[in-house]
């Protein structure tokens, strides 16, 4: 393992990376054995985790030898069996080898991804979800168009193996990978497909394949986009105001020509900015409409010829930020013109300059959220609240707490939007649905429930937004809450709820794609 880190920066190392001997290290299978037992212990009774699950390293060697001989009768990826005890021994060794394969491939991949993205392409990579919103606020106002793309989730298994061969010359180490991918492709649910669909399950092997596939796409795409991003000529007179001039001057580099007395001022920052959230990358572009069309055409051709995958044109959409909205992550994003007044005083004379700046304006997606609430049976498709019948067996406090948690998550997540009027419509739907649920439980009306239980129960719920206005860092929050926004740092916990409507749209596209 130390050899990987010592030779990580050498380009020739990736072509001489021999991983096959690592498959015969007993420590590797001890780690995979423990991980398999930890995962399976939650789904199997403890009495089944007995001495029958003792790992035999000799059996593992024989299994690897059979894989090396391309014996496809060995099923490495075993799907859900109707009999949980049938072929459990085969599944046990198959999962152990699969876990070991993942561990072996993760070691060079982690080093390769670090140096390929950050070293070769010289790109600043921000891996945290909390850097998305500052990035959007900083880059989107200076762009006029965006490309909303979806990462292709379907790919032929042989293409994945060939991409691994680009940086791993050791062919025997790729036989287990090829066997796993083809066995999964020949499974009943994928038998009618000509391509493999990476399942959206939380298994370590398929998460590794997804991360590798995304990193492979981005590493090649970054280098191409960087070559096509040329510097813009900029004169010194382009700075009418001196606000933050020192910070702007850091982003400028001067080129001098031999046969020219003039210097060319160019921006270091490229015209093209890339951000990815989950499976939805967004490319912000500053340029003419022809440049946007060329980038969109390049993305389609790139997927078609590099990954031998036909990508439908609707999977790469172009939008103008001033006219259209884009969805990411859970918001509808647009850029609006915001005029501001900057006053500068020079030599006892007052000059007033009217400057027009762009500002990102995130909009709460009211219609998709109402559709999500209708799917969860909180209202109908028109937004009329209905009772949540599946919660009528709970206690009153549990019902109020569940409705309260949903509202807190929605308000907490979308507090970064200026226009919050739509949120109060969602609040009305949830509060009335909560009242109807309590009335249905007690077999009465909303008026009777409010009279018997008292209004203090409703005061307890749906009022958490007042706590946000009284935070210590927001002085005079009552007056500032309507014109300032706060990106809260716990959005990973709220994010699945906020993006559920986008998953529904992706499923519709997948169904059209399968047909």
From Swiss-Prot:
Any matching Pfam family: Intron_maturas2
A single GO molecular function term of this UniProt record: RNA binding
Protein origin, superkingdom: Eukaryota
GO cellular component assignments: chloroplast
Compartments it resides in: Plastid, Chloroplast
Coiled-coil ranges from the UniProt annotation: none
GO terms under biological process: mRNA processing; RNA splicing; tRNA processing
Keyword entries, A-Z: Chloroplast, mRNA processing, Plastid, RNA-binding, tRNA processing
PANTHER family attached to this UniProt entry: MATURASE K
Family listed: Belongs to the intron maturase 2 family. MatK subfamily.
Function comment: Usually encoded in the trnK tRNA gene intron. Probably assists in splicing its own and other chloroplast group II introns.
Protein name, UniProt field: Maturase K
